[in-house]
């Protein structure tokens, strides 16, 4: 069986908001609504606690040309301003009285040509494609030995959670991958508190002021 993952990515942080697995025989234009609904559900789940924005608030939808269609552009929510790459056309476009589709297509085309639209498309190429490269190529998720879409999706979501955790660690400590942590200066310390012995890993992290901070993690403990 073949499946295709779709990511909803925050272009500011690069974090994956939603990752949905679809059957590979479904086109991008038919799966976009399901993926956006999943992103909305996840944002609503954390909105009250974390103050996360909801999908009903104004947002920009940036996508490649595979998601471009008249129906997709017409059916987008009012809060959405689309910037979806437009495939090439032969000849003139004919609307047959469908003014809503005409306005949606021309509005999307105009936003793509703006400086903001060009900047968002560059960010899409960097951050969205990076999430796929980390999960599918570097992460080895191009091929999985699992049966059923539900099992594949659960495995993939765990992988995406690890990708998001790397972004969080990089923001907090400056290192987000095992290779990055391996390059950090570190030391192992042995400490004894009463009858409790601790093995502590200390990692020195550079900050903007060139005065290193340190992070301590207890990696083992035992009672004497």
Spell out what each predicted region is.
Residues 1-224:
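Anion-binding and metal-coordination hotspots
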